[in-house]
Design a protein with these regions (language model features):
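Short, well-ordered alpha-helical segments
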Residues: 57-64, 168-172, 176
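Hydrophobic ligand-binding cavity/cleft-lining segments
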Residues: 1-84
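Glycine-rich portal/gate segments that line the openings of hydrophobic small-molecule binding cavities
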Residues: 4, 36-41, 50, 69-124, ...
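Hydrophobic residues positioned within well-ordered beta-strands of beta-sheet architectures
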Residues: 19-21, 45-47, 89-90, 106-108, ...
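Beta-strand/loop substructures that line and gate deep hydrophobic ligand-binding cavities in soluble
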Residues: 121-168, 172
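Short loop segments at secondary-structure junctions
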Residues: 53-55, 113-115, 139-140
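Generic detector of well-ordered alpha-helical segments enriched in charged/polar residues
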Residues: 8, 23, 162-163, 167, ...
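Membrane-targeting and insertion segments and their boundary/processing signals
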Residues: 28-45, 103-106, 140-151
Length: 185
């Protein structure tokens, strides 16, 4: 199956106009991002990234949840608090804004579909809502990773600012994630 066919199947649910140039950029290392609004004070984003590693290796590292502090610099703690069929995670993060630093924490229910996807749903935390989804697909000799997040903070920040922050920060975080994943190879 060609990388182009796989890319088209992954992005079929997206509103983004995909073409050969965007697909080529993705395989060459670009992070492609699509933001959208989510409630009045929230935002949603999907980022796509190609990782030049086989899916089983990527999966093994992504499901090592304490390592997420290496992937996302704002995450200060990531720990599994319950193992089993349904995992529970605790994550804490700190983000500096213009004149203040926001500290957040979240308890997540995690559902894994072995080697294919990870779903994170907020159980409780300092968000009004939070939902994230990671999907992995084979793509040539590597893996295509799609990461979707939708969140609404407890503090009223206009949606446009949340979307801009997601659009700016998620690609940098994804590059860091790819760097850490490939370094461990």
């Amino acid at each position: 199956m060609s990388a182009s066919h796989i890319l088209n199947s992954i992005i079929a649910g997206s509103d983004m106009a995909w073409n050969q140039d965007k697909q080529r950029l993705l395989v060459q290392g670009e992070i492609l991002v699509e933001t959208r609004s989510h409630k009045a004070w929230g935002g949603a984003v999907t980022a796509w990234m190609y990782v030049p590693m086989v899916r089983s290796q990527v999966w093994q590292q992504l499901t090592d949840y304490p390592r997420w502090v290496q992937y996302f610099p704002d995450i200060t703690k990531s720990e599994v608090i319950h193992r089993g069929e349904a995992k529970r995670l605790y994550q804490a993060a700190q983000k500096a804004f213009l004149f203040f630093t926001a500290q957040v924490e979240i308890y997540l229910n995690v559902v894994e579909v072995l080697g294919q996807q990870i779903q994170f749903r907020m159980e409780k935390g300092t968000f009004e809502d939070f939902d994230a989804h990671l999907e992995l697909k084979d793509c040539g000799n590597g893996t295509l990773l799609a990461y979707t997040v939708q969140a609404t903070p407890n503090i009223p920040i206009p949606s446009i600012f949340i979307q801009q922050a997601m659009n700016f920060e998620l690609p940098a975080n994804m590059r860091k994630m790819r760097q850490v994943l490939c370094k461990a190879q």
